[in-house]
Amino acid sequence: MAQSKRVKAIAAAVVPGKTYAFEDAIKILKTSTKAKFVESIDVAVRLGVDAKKSDQQVRGSTVLPAGTGKSVRVAVFAPAGAKADEALAAGAEAVGMDDLAEKMQAGDLNYDVVIATPDAMRVVGKLGTLLGPRGLMPNPKVGTVSPNPGEAVKNAKSGQVRYRTDKAGIIHCTIGKASFDDEALKSNLQALLLDLVKAKPATSKGTYLQKVSVSSTMGPGVTVDQSSLSLK
């Protein structure tokens, strides 16, 4: 089905202004998923924050209980010894210090996540212009600067997603694949939303989780009725 036809098909199934129970929203997306690859299911969450204010920017990470369905390549900056061994044992594809930095500067950047121990940031700091634009710069707010690199690697590989508000105060995140069953997708979304609630800025006023919409990779969004998510 051509993309324009798919978009029209989803649009035709969605009543403007209506919110849908999570299961119904996912059903609409799955019945319209016709791409030649397994599409991701994404979520957009509009938060009740003023993203222009530094104290109302929301940034963090969540380990999705059902994973993301993606294979994740991880590089770790850690000094030789116990921390480096811990990262390798957890499955990191590359571990090092200056030697790893030199490889990255030479073009070896085929990684989805870069993690660093605090004492390795002196090396990583020199790679800011290289890693920053690619979204790979380690940051303690999202758990990629950690004194426990083994745990950080396990989180990254087991379904950790990172998020931050855009200029409109919206969080965009993947919660799995269209091939996931509904319960897996629901548990992932619940975990994300609960973590977002925990990250609510103290200065945020009014309704915090203003709107939750799900979409497939190639399709428009469907607004979810939050009461169907049983958030506690």
Swiss-Prot record:
The keyword RNA-binding applies. GO terms for biological process: regulation of translation; translation. Keywords: Repressor, Ribonucleoprotein, Ribosomal protein, RNA-binding, rRNA-binding, Translation regulation, tRNA-binding. One of its GO terms (molecular function) is rRNA binding. One of its GO terms (cellular component) is cytosolic large ribosomal subunit. The keyword GTP-binding does not apply. CDD domains: Ribosomal_L1 (cd00403). Binds directly to 23S rRNA. The L1 stalk is quite mobile in the ribosome, and is involved in E site tRNA release. PANTHER family: 54S RIBOSOMAL PROTEIN L1, MITOCHONDRIAL, LARGE RIBOSOMAL SUBUNIT PROTEIN UL1M. HAMAP family: Ribosomal_uL1_B. Belongs to the universal ribosomal protein uL1 family. Part of the 50S ribosomal subunit. This is Large ribosomal subunit protein uL1. The gene is rplA.
